[in-house]
Curated annotation (Swiss-Prot):
Gene that this sequence comes from: ADGRA3
Membrane topology: Multi-pass membrane protein
Signal peptide: 1-33
Keyword terms of this UniProt record: Disulfide bond, G-protein coupled receptor, Glycoprotein, Immunoglobulin domain, Leucine-rich repeat, Membrane, Receptor, Repeat, Signal, Transducer, Transmembrane, Transmembrane helix
Role according to the record: Orphan receptor that may have a role in planar cell polarity pathway.
Chain intervals with Polar residues compositional bias: 1073-1083, 1233-1250
Quaternary structure and partners: Interacts (via PDZ-binding motif) with DLG1.
Name of this protein: Adhesion G protein-coupled receptor A3
Pfam families assigned to the protein according to its UniProt record, in alphabetical order: 7tm_2 (PF00002), GPS (PF01825), I-set (PF07679), LRR_8 (PF13855)
Species in which this protein is naturally found: Homo sapiens (Human)
Keyword Ligase: no
Motif (PDZ-binding): 1319-1321
Entry's Gene Ontology molecular function annotations: G protein-coupled receptor activity
Placement of LRR repeats on the sequence: 82-103, 106-127, 130-151, 154-175, 594-620
Length: 1321
């Protein structure tokens, strides 16, 4: 038997070979084996062995036809019969017909995801007995029943997620006997009573429901379907439809005759559902005459019910609200839309801008009959406390009526635009209880400290509502302090603007509600058994007593404030607390069982009001009218208000005491009340004395009645009259217990705020003197700018310094107490902040300038071809002195404008304490410290270098170039020209010591003035009086110092004043440039001295060169005298040596000579007595330097001068000062011009400042040229004038051409003029 078996085993390989070839051909050709047709284009056929141990005929096939946009399932004959997996996902298959997959009996997995399947016929999956996995995810399946899944007996996993059905009916999966996993998550899944069967079926069949959660109702959203408790799966109202919409869904604006179709669709959840149409609550049915057509209800895909409405001919009556109404036994639901029908000639509402407390709204041009909507402005804070869904857009609406006019509007859904109002609204929405009432009240109290800045009526209304809520808890023992906090809040509200309080009273009776809440505080507190209750605040004082009617002998109560009568802040700030936070500024009560006022005299107080209750208040007649509680014990309340702000008259009060708001409350308001009594006691007078805070006319005594003007309240004068009145006090008498006050007509009068708006007279007087002195300095330095010898930088610094001190003083005396106007007060704070910082910065700039001049070193010669450095602009000083304060103030104001102005605890205009530390006190202290360091450095430098006394001028650019070009010719010029320095070389008349003294004392006096002024306005009596006088003394000292230092002690300023006030005394200034008359025929020719030193100073000059060139010689007065008289000439080698001991006394006593008038004529030959070429120029320069300085004090006369006959009539301090200055300049010349052996060293040893006097005057030195005549007049009014026959600034060169320096007359004489003791030849 074995061999046949072996033979059979050997016969198998020939049979397997054809089968393998057929399978290979099927794979390569893409066709199905076993006679199957080819796959459609784009499909992929994948066949591979299932396993090594499986028979050859049991092959597995996978067909993938994904993303081919197939519109229907492929015919079964196009697929291999042995297909195991069929992928038809991501196509456009819309329906599955009966027998769509017949013949695929081996199919185990069918994937139909992401198609458009909406209809599945029963038996669609018939023949798929081997199918184990079916995926119908993300289709449009709405109808599911058991017949659909008939024949799927081996189906293990079914996925129906992402379809349209909202519920599954019982028995849907009865034919799926092998089902183990199920998914049916949809966007419309409704977990109600219709899926209760699912819980039982899942447990019985042991089915796993994956990733399926409830979507509706909202209460079960996101809960697993099988995890919901069965008792929650109900079909009770309200009805929540998974899908319900109406198109169009928004308001429709149409014209008459138009056609408008509507559609309404809802989730089909019950068989009795129906859709109805309504217009303005009336049911709508088909009416062909009016063009209305209603389609019957239609069921779509077993999931939606729909209905349609068509209005084919719209008329004006179609305007209204149209709705789609879904009706079921489980409840109803409605969707509506507005229809506006317009005529052909419709009108429009114009565009309009509305600004209110909810924001800025710009309404567009809108058709008549249309309601316009605008989105509210979103704010980050408080957005969660407004009504509506936070996800919804909150909008304001406004209706435009048919006439084209804006009508109703609504902004209630919008947040308040103002931060203050928004926060107060948040307070108002907070839930209150006994635990958090006190804490919330304290938070509100802290916020109402800024009540003076309230700008919206809703601010006051919200606070009034909060006070009413707090009042409910005042009766509780745990909330004892709540009453005190309520009084403080009401006191802060009195700081608000009267207009805001008036609007709040008119809108919601807010002020009256606050007062009535305060009246109930004492009632609740005394109900607990207490006999006395009192609470005080800056603007309100409350006192309550339990009084026995028996033995009552009357009572006098006084309202006072613990400040001195001379305290000027006692009347204006209306009870603001003082900076230390104590309550000395608050109102207080003091009562005494007496009916006389004299026994209640209080020291150091301001009595605001007093009230006298007579002994007959509890007479036997009244005792019967009263309703006693606890054996004839009565609760007496007294409330005092600093002013009448909480009692505004809002209605038509023409017939009342205020006479249509013509009269105003000008006194405090005092309230008297006995609990349980509200009757007029016509026969019992109550005397009230009130202090007036304003002056007016037509005074009327009045009492407040809360019931007048429909509950708005008003003042009436019935039963009240005035007993006595003087300038400040008014006594009235009323015959009822009420709120008492005095009203006056303030037309043309202002609030009596003398103590608030006026400082002490000493402050004003001394400040005016300081302002006048500063103004005099500013005007003098601006008007006489060209005559005052001061550098341009120093001039700018001094003028700006004076201006900012002037600005500080003006703003201080004029605005420091203007606390009633918030805007003005803020402006005062900003200006004071700026001017103070600017002043100390300009002092610092001045100190830095002095330091640079003191430490300045001599400049060396530079290459003539090298361009000079660019000039540094004056703007840099303004950027420091004015720019830095502007930046600091700008940042402070931009951060919070409320940093400036009056604080609630300060009766002056300045800054808040915290911002001022970093924005003012810190920078000001640092700048002051830097200034002091500069002053100390200058002082040390001057001690080390006592020779540095004056500030010298800088050579101009042209002078520097000329000096560099003339270096080779210096040996040919008189050495006197190298060392010639006069007062014209001074840049500033003041010495460095004087400038240092001026800057340091200015800073010291300014800081002292600022501090004393601040103390004078911030402290109370008597310290404010003391510092007012100290301020005055400092101000006078400051004034005297400024005028003396910057004006009186300066010769140039004094000269300018003399020229302005006494023009006749300055006649010489007119003669300065006048040429003298010809003297040839009068005086003849002056004698000549050929061997004089005047001749010897002109070296190496021929006759022709002397005639035709402008090289010229410089002759001092002494040289000119020597030229006239050879016997009196100085020896050549006997030049006196000048050392550091050169003083005014030595110069005046060493040489005393008088040189007669001199006239020099040109001569043709000048050869005799010429100096030797090898003569030392250093000795000559030294000699001429000393002679030049001597020449300053040698009195001479010039022929033809009007002053040559005036004697020296005055020798005083001014002349001594001038001589000392010239002596110093001579010393400085000698220091800068040491003896030189040859001309080759001139450039390296001579500073540029010394060469400044050898170059011609350039265009940049016009200011110095303008100053010279004035200086000549000042120095020569008391003596004759020297004569110099050479040009002071050296030869003039222009384009290589030389010309005569001065013209001559017909006789050849030189025309001489007076110019700084010199005559130009």
């Amino acid at each position: 038997m074995e061999p046949p078996g072996r033979r059979r085993g050997r016969a198998q390989p020939p049979l397997l070979l054809p089968l393998s070839l057929l399978a290979l051909l099927a794979l390569l050709g893409g066709g199905g084996g076993g006679g199957a047709a080819a796959l459609p284009a784009g499909c992929k056929h994948d066949g591979r062995p299932r396993g090594a141990g499986r028979a050859a005929g049991a092959a597995e096939g996978k067909v993938v036809c994904s993303s081919l946009e197939l519109a229907q399932v492929l015919p079964p004959d196009t697929l291999p019969n042995r297909t195991v997996t069929l992928i038809l996902s991501n196509n456009k298959i819309s329906e599955l017909k009966n027998g769509s997959f017949s013949g695929l009996s081996l199919l185990e997995r069918l994937d139909l995801r992401n198609n458009l399947i909406s209809s599945i016929d029963p038996g669609a999956f018939w023949g798929l007995s081997s199918l184990k996995r079916l995926d119908l995810t993300n289709n449009r399946i709405g109808c599911l029943n058991a017949d659909i899944f008939r024949g799927l007996t081996n189906l293990v996993r079914l996925n129906l997620s992402g379809n349209l059905f909202s519920s599954l009916s019982q028995g849907t999966f009865d034919y799926l006997a092998s089902l183990r996993s199920l998914e049916f998550q949809t966007e419309y899944l409704l977990c109600d009573c219709n899926i209760l069967w699912m819980h039982r079926w899942v447990k019985e069949k042991n089915i796993t429901v994956r990733d399926t959660r409830c979507v509706y109702p909202k209460s079960l959203q996101a809960q697993p379907v099988t995890g919901v408790k069965q008792e929650l799966l109900t079909c009770d109202p309200p009805l929540e439809l998974p899908s319900f919409y109406m198109t169009p869904s928004h308001r429709q604006v149409v014209f008459e005759g138009d056609s408008l179709p509507f559609q309404c669709m809802a989730s089909y959840i019950d068989q009795d559902m129906q859709v109805l149409w309504y217009q303005d609550g009336r049911i709508v049915e088909t009416d062909e005459s009016q063009g209305i057509f209603v389609e019957k209800n239609m069921i779509h895909n077993c999931s939606l019910i729909a209905s349609a409405l068509t209005i084919s001919n719209i008329q004006a009556g179609s305007t209204g609200n149209w709705g789609c109404h879904v009706q079921t036994k489980r409840g109803n639901n409605t969707r509506t839309v507005d229809i506006v029908v317009l005529e052909s000639s419709a009108q429009y509402c114009p565009p309009e801008r509305v600004v209110n407390n909810k924001g800025d709204f710009r309404w567009p041009r809108t058709l008549a009959g249309i309601t316009a909507y605008l989105q509210c402005t979103r704010n980050t804070h408080g957005s969660g406390i407004y009504p509506g869904n936070p996800q919804d857009e909150r909008k304001a609406w406004r209706r435009c009526d048919r006439g084209g006019f804006w009508a109703d509007d609504d902004y209630s859904r919008c947040q308040y635009a103002n931060d203050v109002t928004r926060v107060l609204y948040m307070f108002n929405q907070m839930p209150l209880n006994l635990t958090n009432a006190v804490a919330t009240a304290r938070q509100l109290l802290a916020y109402t400290v800024e009540a003076a800045n309230f700008s919206d009526k809703m601010d006051v209304i919200f606070v009034a509502e909060m006070i009413e809520k707090f009042g409910r808890f005042t009766k509780e023992e745990k909330s004892k302090e709540l009453g005190d906090v309520m009084v403080d809040i009401a006191s802060n509200i009195m700081l608000a603007d009267e207009r805001v309080l008036w609007l709040a009273q008119r809108e919601a009776k807010a002020c009256s509600r606050i007062v009535q809440c305060l009246q109930r505080i004492a009632t609740y507190r005394l109900a607990g058994g207490a006999h006395v209750y009192s609470t005080y605040s800056p603007n309100i004082a409350l006192e309550a007593y339990v009084i026995k009617s028996t033995g009552f002998t009357g009572m006098t109560c006084t309202v006072f404030q613990k400040v001195a009568a001379s305290d000027r802040t006692g009347l204006s700030d209306y009870g603001r607390r003082d900076p230390e936070g104590n309550l000395d500024k608050q109102l207080s009560f003091k009562c005494n069982v007496s009916n006389t006022f004299s026994s209640l005299a209080l020291k150091n107080t301001i009595v605001e009001a007093s009230i006298q209750l007579p002994p007959s208040l509890f007479s036997p007649k009244q005792k019967r009218e009263l309703r006693p509680t606890d054996d004839s014990l009565y609760k007496l309340q007294l409330i005092a208000f600093r002013n009448g702000k909480l009692f505004p008259a809002t209605g038509n009060s023409t017939n009342l005491a205020d006479d249509g708001k013509r009269r105003t409350v000008v006194t405090p308001v005092i309230l008297t009340k006995i609990d349980g009594v509200n009757v007029d006691t016509h026969h019992i007078p109550v005397n009230v004395t009130l202090r007036r805070i304003a002056h007016g006319a037509d005074a009327v005594a009045a009492r407040w009645d809360f019931d007048l003007l429909n509950g708005q309240g008003g003042w009436k004068s019935d039963g009240c009259h005035i007993l006595y009145s003087d300038e400040n006090i008014t006594t009235i008498q009323c015959y009822s217990l009420s709120n008492y006050a005095v009203l006056m007509d303030l037309t043309g009068s202002e609030l009596y705020t003398q103590a608030a708006s006026l400082l002490h007279p000493v402050v004003y007087t001394t400040a005016i003197i300081l302002l006048l002195c500063l103004l005099a300095v500013i005007v003098s330095y601006i008007y006489h700018h060209s005559l005052i010898r001061i550098s341009l930088k120093s001039w700018h610094m001094l003028v700006n310094l004076c201006f900012h001190i002037f600005l500080t003083c003006v703003v201080f005396v004029g605005g420091i107490t203007q606390t009633r106007n918030a805007s003005i007060c803020q402006a005062v704070g900003i200006i004071l902040h700026y001017s103070t910082l600017a002043t100390v910065l300009w002092v610092g700039v001045t100190a830095r300038n002095i330091y640079k001049q003191v430490t300045k070193k001599a400049k060396r010669c530079q290459d003539p071809d090298e361009p000079p450095p660019p000039p540094r602009p004056m703007l840099r000083f303004y950027l420091i002195g004015g720019g830095i304060p502007i930046i600091v103030c700008g940042i402070t104001a931009a951060a919070n404008i409320k940093n400036y102005g009056s604080r609630p605890n300060a009766p002056y205009c300045w800054m808040a304490w915290e911002p001022s530390l970093g924005a003012f006190y810190g920078p000001a202290s640092f700048i002051t410290f830097v200034n002091c360091m500069y002053f100390l450095s200058i002082f040390i430098q001057l001690k080390r270098h006592p020779e540095r006394k004056y500030e010298l001028k800088e050579p101009t650019e042209e002078q520097q170039r000329l000096a560099a070009n003339e270096n080779g010719e210096i040996n040919h010029q008189d050495s006197m020209s190298l060392s010639l320095i006069s007062t014209s070389a001074l840049e500033n008349e003041h010495t460095f010591h004087s400038q240092l003294l001026g800057a340091s004392l200015t800073l010291l006096l300014y800081v002292a003035l600022w501090m004393f002024g601040a103390l004078a306005v911030s402290l109370y009596y008597p310290l404010d009086l003391v510092f007012s006088f100290v301020f005055g003394a400092t101000s006078l000292s400051f004034s005297a110092f400024f005028v003396v230092h910057h004006c009186v002690n300066r010769e140039d300023v004094r000269l300018a004043w003399i020229m302005t006030c006494c023009p006749g005394r300055s006649s010489y200034s007119v003669q300065v440039n006048v040429q003298p008359p010809n003297s040839n025929g009068t005086n003849g020719e002056a004698p000549k001295c050929p061997n004089s030193s005047a001749e010897s100073s002109c070296t190496n000059k021929s006759a022709s060169s002397f005639k035709n060139s402008s090289q010229g010689c410089k002759l001092t007065n002494l040289q000119a005298a020597a030229a006239q008289c050879h016997a009196n000439s100085l020896p050549l080698n006997s030049t006196p040596q000048l050392d550091n001991s050169l003083t005014e006394h030595s110069m005046d006593n060493d040489i005393k000579m008088h040189v007669a008038p001199l006239e020099v004529q040109f001569r043709t030959n000048v050869h005799s007595s010429r100096h030797h070429k090898n003569r030392s120029k250093g000795h000559r320069a030294s000699r001429l330097t000393v002679l030049r300085e001597y020449a300053y004090d040698v009195p001479t006369s010039v022929e033809g001068s009007v002053q040559n006959g005036l004697p020296k009539s005055r020798l005083g301090n001014n002349e001594g000062h001038s001589r000392s200055r010239r002596a110093y300049l001579a010393y400085r010349e000698r220091q800068y011009n040491p003896p030189q052996q040859d001309s080759s060293d001139a450039c390296s040893t001579l500073p540029k400042s010394s060469r400044n006097f050898e170059k011609p005057v350039s265009t940049t030195s016009k200011k110095d040229a303008l100053r010279k005549p004035a200086v000549v007049e000042l120095e020569n009014q008391q003596k004759s004038y020297g004569l110099n026959l050479a040009i002071q600034n050296g030869p003039i060169k222009s384009n290589g051409q030389e010309g005569p320096l001065l013209g001559t007359d017909s006789t050849g004489n030189v025309r001489t003029g007076l110019w700084k003791h010199e005559t130009t030849v």
